[in-house]
Amino acid sequence: MSALDAYKIRQDFAILDQVVNDEPLVYLDNAATTQKPQVVLDTLMAYYHEDNANVHRGVHTLAERATAAYEASREKLRQFINAKSTKEVLFTRGTTTGLNWVGRFAEQVLEPGDEVVISIMEHHSNIIPWQEACKKTGAKLVYAYLKDGQLDMEDLANKITKKTKFVSLAQVSNVLGCINPVKEIAKLAHQVGAYMVVDGAQSAPHMAIDVQDLDCDFFTLSGHKMLGPTGIGVLYGKEEILNQMNPIEFGGEMIDFVYEQEATWKELPWKFEAGTPNIAGAIALGAAVDYLSALGMENIHAYEQELVDYVLPKLQAIDGLTVYGPENPTQHAGVIAFNIDGLHPHDVATALDYEGVAVRAGHHCAQPLINHLGISSAARASFYIYNTKEDCDKLVEAILATKEFFNGTL
């Protein structure tokens, strides 16, 4: 049994107490965004009520308190991912921003004939920046494909060559739910002198992250997918690499000195944080990290595995329902994409909503993967710390009711 008590955890999330379409809300769209515990909401309000001031600028009391809280949150994030230094922890708007920043760095170093290796399962945020970087530099974008609903490691290893300059992969697929062995892949990348980039949007909220152990060169995460506010995230980069990177945005507070014709930059991490940052979001993300750390990331991962072990076989047993990704629950994170024969995923999601069950339907910002699977879209249920086995049962019951309803109307 897991050390987590989901029923106790749910008490911290007032939003989950509501009724939707005369049914208790079952929120299973956590891969899109997570709900926020009361302590995160309180932290946001406390900043605006008590400490609202700009950071790194003023010497008055409010400014000093805001700056201290902002930088304390950076230290919490450093510990959360086990970076060596807060110099390696850059606040961003989210994973998309972080990957775009890495893409801009790639434009500095890529040359014609170089290659960037990604996988077919990537989120658009880990595809388009590389497409653009390759277009601008004459480099080539190379895809690794799937085997049995997972990354084909043999194919990936064959694609990583002396031409490879970047390897960029999601640690957990936001559609297939498979967990990619990024530590092993980082070794392959470094053997040929390539940079290893990890999209941690779907992994950082759900498992312990140690960027030093992974030996990745970059790692990105989004606060809103791990109980924090929207509009805040982190890009981790090894200090020696970040020192090589040009600033992405220019303006206030990222400068050391501005002359009439040129300027010099501050040291890390501030040379990448131009303008007034999302101060409240960063501080509240620190509160979210405190909340998750108190539960224990190992406990969170183990509990979510219990839910997957419980619900995945039930879904696989439903006649006419196809689950995408690994068949073995132990290889499947808490993201389950599926389709029902003869039904459009949007109709399925709408019908489930009538039963109070919130899931997502669409291409999940992964159109190359969806095309590769030979489908146009899929429904997706995704789980988190406040979900229960009763939520799993409700999902299965709602799917069966949906099938029965549409079978009666077709």
Q: Predicted segment positions?
A:
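Pyridoxal 5′-phosphate
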Residues: 1-410
